């Protein structure tokens, strides 16, 4: 919205300060502060309201960690509503709303947030850990993801040097190579977005565990978006130039700000859980940003923590079905370490460290070739 004001009045020279709004870095900073303020401001009242409405709070897995059943019982869920409020307000206020990349990632974030909310509502009202049918949810996730990818393919500005880049997969290190999937990119892009959403959903099992790694990934991809959306920087780093995608940095800033605001209430011991409302929305957002910037493969590195959590579940289920035995004491893998005797805070902080290191490795691939 404010970028529109800049476009309307900056040329007149009557309000010189509006010229600051042409800088994506300036608007990204404002998006961080705005989103954080919104979440912190609404947090206390929203949590009290959720406690009154939900009563027993989020159901805790009876077969899970014993102390969780005792310590976390009664904690309300759906805190993702707070995250979405800050994220969407920060994005809509400070980004260029004529940019199709912005609307694509907003569609995924809001759509997945709504799906997660429906899932959380079912769990709370039925007091069960099973929500909406997995197949139905997966189908809706795929539909929303393909709609977002279609927006990018149809409406985004085509790179002048490589117009086919909008439907292509690029590779880290091997920067000069890309594979044009044509309309098959709809399926590939949807796979990345759906996979990222559910990977973050698996990770969200301890206080603050998913929030910080998502912010780290958002910071990394915010930098990537700014670089590949700038012709000078992308040319220097020999990255594929993606015109217009730099605006995604503002969205990433709002994501970081909303995450910081939520962490104020989600730090151990959590006063509220983000629930599927938050984890699906945040994971989908990260996946959509990876698709928009054409750095989908790098997400496996930057989001390596989420990949590890997902693989631990897949391996555990597959091995148990085949042999009747478990490889991990409990999956996802963060619960395995709890079963080994690690405290919750130890698991969370060490996983944060891993997320930081993986993000740095992922960013390092921008320079390697």
UniProtKB/Swiss-Prot annotation:
A Pfam short name: Glycos_transf_4
Function comment: Catalyzes the initial step of the lipid cycle reactions in the biosynthesis of the cell wall peptidoglycan: transfers peptidoglycan precursor phospho-MurNAc-pentapeptide from UDP-MurNAc-pentapeptide onto the lipid carrier undecaprenyl phosphate, yielding undecaprenyl-pyrophosphoryl-MurNAc-pentapeptide, known as lipid I.
Organism of provenance: Phenylobacterium zucineum (strain HLK1)
Entry protein name: Phospho-N-acetylmuramoyl-pentapeptide-transferase
Gene name tied to this protein: mraY
A biological process from GO: cell division
Catalysed reactions listed for this entry: UDP-N-acetyl-alpha-D-muramoyl-L-alanyl-gamma-D-glutamyl-meso-2,6-diaminopimeloyl-D-alanyl-D-alanine + di-trans,octa-cis-undecaprenyl phosphate = di-trans,octa-cis-undecaprenyl diphospho-N-acetyl-alpha-D-muramoyl-L-alanyl-D-glutamyl-meso-2,6-diaminopimeloyl-D-alanyl-D-alanine + UMP
Locations listed in the record: Cell inner membrane
Family listed: Belongs to the glycosyltransferase 4 family. MraY subfamily.
GO-annotated molecular function: metal ion binding; phospho-N-acetylmuramoyl-pentapeptide-transferase activity; UDP-N-acetylmuramoyl-L-alanyl-D-glutamyl-meso-2,6-diaminopimelyl-D-alanyl-D-alanine:undecaprenyl-phosphate transferase activity
Listed PANTHER family: PHOSPHO-N-ACETYLMURAMOYL-PENTAPEPTIDE-TRANSFERASE, PHOSPHO-N-ACETYLMURAMOYL-PENTAPEPTIDE-TRANSFERASE HOMOLOG
Topology term for the membrane: Multi-pass membrane protein
Domain of life according to the entry: Bacteria
Keywords for the protein's UniProt record, in alphabetical order: Cell cycle, Cell division, Cell inner membrane, Cell membrane, Cell shape, Cell wall biogenesis/degradation, Magnesium, Membrane, Metal-binding, Peptidoglycan synthesis, Transferase, Transmembrane, Transmembrane helix
GO cellular component, one term: plasma membrane
């Amino acid at each position: 919205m404010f970028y529109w004001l800049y476009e309307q009045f900056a040329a007149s020279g009557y309000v010189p300060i509006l010229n600051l709004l042409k800088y994506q870095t300036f608007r990204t900073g404002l998006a961080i502060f705005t989103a954080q303020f919104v979440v912190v401001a609404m947090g206390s009242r929203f949590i009290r309201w959720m406690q009154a409405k939900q009563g027993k709070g989020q159901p805790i897995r009876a077969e899970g960690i014993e102390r969780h059943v005792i310590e976390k019982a009664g904690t309300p869920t759906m805190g993702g509503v707070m995250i979405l409020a800050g994220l969407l307000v920060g994005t809509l206020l400070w980004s260029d709303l004529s940019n199709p990349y912005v609307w694509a990632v907003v569609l995924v974030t809001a759509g997945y947030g709504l799906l997660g909310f429906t899932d959380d509502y079912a769990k709370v009202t039925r007091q069960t850990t099973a929500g909406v049918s997995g197949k139905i949810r997966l189908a809706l996730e795929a539909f929303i993801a393909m709609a977002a990818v279609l927006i990018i393919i149809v409406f985004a500005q085509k790179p002048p040097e490589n117009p086919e880049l909008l439907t292509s997969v690029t590779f880290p290190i091997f920067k000069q190579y890309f594979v044009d999937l044509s309309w098959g990119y709809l399926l590939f892009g949807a796979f990345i977005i759906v996979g990222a959403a559910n990977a973050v959903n698996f990770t969200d099992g301890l206080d603050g565990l998913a929030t910080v790694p998502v912010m780290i990934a958002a910071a990394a991809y915010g930098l990537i978006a700014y670089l590949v959306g700038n012709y000078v920087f992308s040319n220097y780093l020999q990255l594929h130039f993606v015109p217009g995608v730099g605006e995604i940095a503002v969205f990433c800033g709002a994501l970081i700000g909303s995450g910081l605001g939520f962490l104020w209430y989600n730090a151990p011991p959590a006063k509220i859980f983000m629930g599927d409302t938050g984890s699906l929305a945040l994971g989908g957002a990260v996946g959509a940003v990876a698709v928009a910037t054409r750095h989908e493969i790098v997400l496996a590195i930057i989001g390596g923590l989420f990949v590890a959590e997902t693989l631990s579940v897949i391996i555990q289920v597959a091995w148990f079905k085949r042999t009747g035995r478990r490889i991990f004491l409990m999956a996802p893998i963060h619960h395995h370490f709890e079963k080994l005797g690690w405290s919750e805070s130890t698991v969370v902080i060490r996983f944060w460290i891993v997320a930081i290191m993986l993000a740095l490795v992922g960013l390092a691939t921008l320079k390697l070739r």
